[in-house]
A protein has these predicted regions:
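Ser/Thr/Pro/Gly-rich, low-complexity intrinsically disordered stalk/linker tracts of secreted
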Residues: 1-206, 210, 216, 224-226
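Short beta-strand and strand-turn-strand segments in soluble, beta-rich domains
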Residues: 32, 122-131, 241-256
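Short flexible loop/turn segments that cap and initiate beta-strands
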Residues: 61-65, 163-169, 221-252
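Alpha-helix capping and helix-loop boundary segments enriched in small/acidic/polar residues
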Residues: 207-210, 253-257
């Protein structure tokens, strides 16, 4: 955003007092803040602790404001819970204050409350982890940290959806003024959900073939959830017998796509 020279501010406002450097610091921030995540790729069906870090932007957050991390509704990701810290799929939220500029007042927020709502936002991002702020504001540069599958209390984490997905998105929203009007925090968090290690092989081919014609068969490796494993050019040895006698034998390599 364009910065106004100090002389122009003085001319427009007259004499005023503000912490030195606060204007420049906040003008350098994205207005609605930014989000980051500790993972970029996870295995389908695995247990994880996923940390979402929201750094408040120049807008700050007023008393009673909200923050949401949302997901598409159609997923078999295990449902989050907020009541049993030592159990699976526990989700938590905490506040981290950023350093103050000399003369700047610290944030006054007293506590955060986190909840999970399967239809806590608009389609298609309906599943929502919602953080409410209470009894005070948060200043620009502060952090709200959400842990999906918080393991600090002995829980196993959160069970990821069991099917692979390229560019799984977590879209975050903030209501900075506490008016229940949300704006997206760009860009989205993007995670690659990839297959696990091969657990079984699957054949695919026609049930009917003419006499004397070759029968094409395709073989693929699947993980424990039935996802096709890619980027694993494993060596496979194929043999076939008829009446106890070998009729076919071949060594091949699975493609990496």
């Amino acid at each position: 955003m364009k910065k106004i020279p100090e002389s122009d501010i003085q001319k427009a406002l007259g004499d005023y007092q503000a912490p030195k450097g606060l204007y420049s610091a906040t003008k350098d921030m994205p207005f609605l803040g930014k989000v980051s995540c500790n993972v970029e790729s996870i295995v389908a069906g695995s247990w994880q602790e996923i940390v979402i870090d929201y750094e408040l932007g120049a807008s700050g957050m007023a008393d009673g404001s909200w923050f949401k991390a949302t997901f598409r509704f159609y997923s078999d990701w295990a449902l989050f819970q907020t009541t049993e810290p030592s159990e699976a799929n526990y989700v938590s939220a905490e506040y981290h204050a950023s350093p103050t500029i000399p003369g700047q007042s610290p944030a006054t927020v007293q506590y955060l409350k986190v909840r999970f709502d399967q239809k806590g936002h608009e389609r298609p991002f309906q599943k929502a982890v919602i953080v409410d702020t209470f009894d005070g504001y948060l200043k620009a540069g502060d952090h709200i940290v959400i842990r999906l599958g918080d393991r600090r209390f002995g829980g196993p984490g959160t069970r990821v959806q069991t099917f692979v997905e390229q560019n799984f998105k977590i879209r975050c929203y903030v209501d900075p003024l506490g008016t229940s009007r949300f704006a997206a925090v760009n860009p989205d968090l993007v995670i690659q959900i990839v297959p696990g290690v091969p657990a079984q092989l699957q054949w695919a081919g026609s049930r009917i073939v003419k006499l004397g014609e070759k029968l094409p068969l395709r073989i693929r490796a699947e993980d424990e959830w039935g996802n096709t494993c890619w980027d694993r050019p494993e060596h496979v040895e194929i043999t076939a017998t008829l009446d106890g006698k070998p009729v076919y034998e071949k060594k091949t390599t699975l493609t990496d796509k």
